[in-house]
A protein has these predicted regions:
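Hydrophobic h-region of N-terminal signal peptides that target proteins for export
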Residues: 5-17
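Structural preference for beta-rich elements and adjacent junctions enriched in aromatics
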Residues: 17-341
Length: 341
């Protein structure tokens, strides 16, 4: 009886084991122009990633994407960057939903969106995500750990363009190697997945490699990217200097002036450690918080967007990221006022 039970459980596990598609990257001789149009001849040489299936809502997981919304993705690379191209069909190209907004958060509006996830160490634990909407809004994020921590404050340097065509819309994206981290090997093997959000289908999300979140975390549901050869991790060095001056002039009074200068530096020591330095920080480039009226006796908490404090922020997350964190860095730099809550 025990043997029968064991065989049954083994069969059930194998039947439910995660499907893993694979795709080969194509090495570009000449990098494509990033304009959203897949008109370079080399795109036609790349085998497409297709056969997308429903990812969310999970209650209908596994359904094939409707033929009117056929989706194909193409991946290439050279010595400097990863290149993504995609054709996303739509039955009514002139009325593809598009909503403009700011970077990162704008992709969650009433627009179609397409994204790529890269698990560059193939550990099914961490991944980088890059998103572009049908309105051309881009977003990047970093996901880490069993707790599903994800951060839209990754804010690295990459670019993407979109183009409306007769079949729907297309996109091109460039992801420099400085935007990601990967092992120093002659032949790379990465986890990868592509996904598309379709507003006209109740915001349903379809993925290239099947994702069943009833059984597996998204991190465990990556396909496999192969054939990336002889690329080297670049020097990760970013300098952000600033200089500002002010002049105060009033009639009948002597003019006065002031100035300030500072520097932020980020240096990647290796794939595991990053050195962040800041000298007389200003953080003037960071977007302002939305105004909120606080009628509760508790402190308001806002998203940390200052680059110096976002590196390694996942270390201070609780098991459920929505319930808070062990360390709230936004208090650093505030004036002490015991009368404020």
């Amino acid at each position: 009886m025990r043997l029968i039970s064991f065989i049954f459980l083994l069969f059930f596990y194998l039947n439910q084991s995660q499907v893993r598609k694979s795709i080969e990257a194509y090495r570009f001789e000449t990098p494509p122009e990033i304009d959203g149009k897949l008109n370079e001849s080399e795109w036609k040489k790349i085998k497409a990633a297709d056969g997308f299936t429903l990812m969310r809502p999970v209650t209908k997981h596994g359904q094939k994407i409707p033929s009117d919304y056929e989706t194909k993705a193409f991946l290439g690379y050279d010595d400097k960057a990863i290149y993504l191209g995609a054709q996303l069909n739509h039955p009514d190209p002139e009325n593809i939903p598009k909503e403009f907004g700011r970077r990162d958060w704008g992709v969650f509006g009433k627009s179609e969106a397409f994204w790529i996830s890269l698990d560059t160490f193939d550990d099914r634990f961490n991944s980088f995500g890059f998103v572009v909407s049908s309105a051309g809004i881009i977003a990047d994020l970093y996901r880490s750990g069993d707790f599903g921590f994800s951060s839209l404050n990754y804010d690295t340097v990459f670019d993407a363009k979109v183009h409306i065509n007769d079949q729907g819309w297309s996109l091109e994206m460039i992801i420099p190697y400085s935007a990601i981290r990967f092992p120093k090997k002659d032949i790379q093997k990465w986890g990868i997945n592509f996904a598309r959000k379709i507003v006209d289908l109740d915001n349903s999300e379809f993925s290239w490699n099947p994702v069943d979140e009833n059984l597996f975390e998204y991190q465990e549901s990556m396909g496999l990217l192969t054939n990336i050869k002889k690329i080297n991790p670049p020097l990760r060095l970013f300098l952000y200097p600033y200089l500002q001056t002010a002049v105060n002039s009033q009639k009948g009074l002597k003019s006065s002036s002031s100035y300030s200068a500072g520097l932020d530096l980020k240096y990647g020591i290796n794939n595991s450690f990053t050195l962040d330095l800041t000298l007389i920080p200003d953080f003037g480039q960071v977007s302002f918080d939305d105004t909120e009226l606080n009628l509760s006796p508790f402190e308001q908490q806002f998203t940390e967007r200052r680059p110096f404090f976002t590196e390694g922020a996942d270390l201070f997350k609780k098991a459920d990221e929505r319930t808070g964190k062990f360390f709230y860095s936004r208090r650093i730099g505030q004036k002490i006022n015991f009368n404020e809550s």
